[in-house]
From Swiss-Prot, chains A, B:
Broad EC category: transferase
Origin superkingdom: Archaea
Role: Guanylyltransferase that catalyzes the activation of (2S)-2-phospholactate (2-PL) as (2S)-lactyl-2-diphospho-5'-guanosine, via the condensation of 2-PL with GTP. It is involved in the biosynthesis of coenzyme F420, a hydride carrier cofactor.
Pathway where this protein functions: Cofactor biosynthesis; coenzyme F420 biosynthesis
Assembly mode: Homodimer.
Name this protein carries in UniProt: 2-phospho-L-lactate guanylyltransferase
Pfam family name, one: CofC
GO biological process, one term: F420-0 metabolic process
EC number: 2.7.7.68
Similarity comment: Belongs to the CofC family.
Organism: Methanoculleus marisnigri (strain ATCC 35101 / DSM 1498 / JR1)
Keywords: GTP-binding, Nucleotide-binding, Nucleotidyltransferase, Transferase
One of the record's GO molecular function terms: GTP binding
């Protein structure tokens, strides 16, 4: 089965909730490293990758569409172009593997979906993308389940820690350092001086070697 | 295959990180509701449940051992008693299902493990429990992987959002309200006036109807 993976990506000033520990240049490099991890998994699973970018961007192994409208409008524009099944996958879930994506595309339902933490949606696979519309922001998982019902789609919810782990906050970096063996994003963090640290209550967080800071 | 599920449980003043929204009596009732969800999944999967309690506690459908030593010592004492495979499962992962537990106990490896968020360990299944020792607190997932290696165990890491979601903080309640259909813990939260709410940035959180507060 041939299909496209649609990956929204913000190349300029992304991941602002990480500003407390990464400056803009670093956040841009880190977001690209996570994107590489996602693209690698997508391509290994047999999909072609199309990046929906807010700004001009080049990538050797992916098509790029620059769209300046809000995220939902950009995705819905793209879905309207597709005559084959489509995967909408976020660029900030670097723990995803090709095998994980296979779990979605092998669904017997019309649609499969992976919730993100906190009510979000991290991946949607659609056999008939033109019938669907995306509604990200807020409790998008519930919104997407409702929209699927309105479309008359049968839905499989995929249970996965790796795919549900989107990286937004400092605490999320722990997951990459612990579970991200072999990932470009982990390499980036390690080369930038990040490591696991325990606070006085034994809770796990990250620390940064001050010699590696460019802030 | 016959085996025991070992569930550590603190009946008195549990879940103190929820003190900002639940008083002690409420936290005790909520912890019991989550425990009921876990016990229901455990029993439906064909296991018997043994609670390792810090204080005196009674339960109709589970054996209770009151152990006043620290958590790791209590678990390691219990593992030493077992001559059959054992599951160590936390009482604060109410999204777990019987099918999820089956994924662990059907492993072909010597051990299967489910990481929790933030470096923790939420479930361990051990075919030879007497050889193992638990080391919770801190980055316990990495510690348990190391201990398994020292024991010469082959290990399967199970990828699951539901099982990796332990409920510690106010933000975690979102997961129960969104994904916890049919759970006792969700019923408790709803009856206590909790519902999903969006903040001004569109992020999902919980709110509580002030009429339902007993604080």
């Amino acid at each position: 089965m041939y299909f496209h993976a649609l990956i929204p990506f913000k190349p300029v000033n992304p991941k602002t909730r990480l500003s407390c520990i990464l400056n803009q240049e670093e956040r841009e490099a880190f977001a690209r490293a996570m994107l590489e991890d996602v693209i690698a998994a997508v391509q290994k699973s047999g999909c072609s990758a199309t990046l929906l970018c807010t700004h001009s961007f080049k990538h050797e192994n992916a098509l790029v569409a620059v769209r300046t409208e809000p995220l939902n409008d950009a995705i819905n524009w793209a879905l309207g172009q597709f005559h084959c099944p489509a995967l909408i996958i976020m660029g900030d879930i670097p723990l995803v593997t090709a095998g994980d994506i296979q779990r979605l595309i092998r669904t017997e339902k019309d649609m499969s979906i992976v919730p993100g933490r906190g009510g979000g949606t991290n991946i949607i696979f659609l056999k008939k993308p033109r019938c669907f519309r995306a509604d990200y922001y807020g409790a998008s998982f519930l919104d997407h389940m409702r929209i699927a019902e309105e479309c008359g789609f049968s839905v499989e919810v995929i249970d996965s820690f790796r795919m549900s782990t989107d990286i937004d906050e400092k605490e999320d970096l722990v997951e990459i350092l612990i579970h991200g063996k072999g990932r470009r994003s982990r390499e980036y963090l390690e080369n930038s001086g990040f490591s696991i640290a325990l606070d006085e209550k034994g809770r796990v967080g990250v620390q940064r070697d001050p010699h590696e800071e460019a802030l």
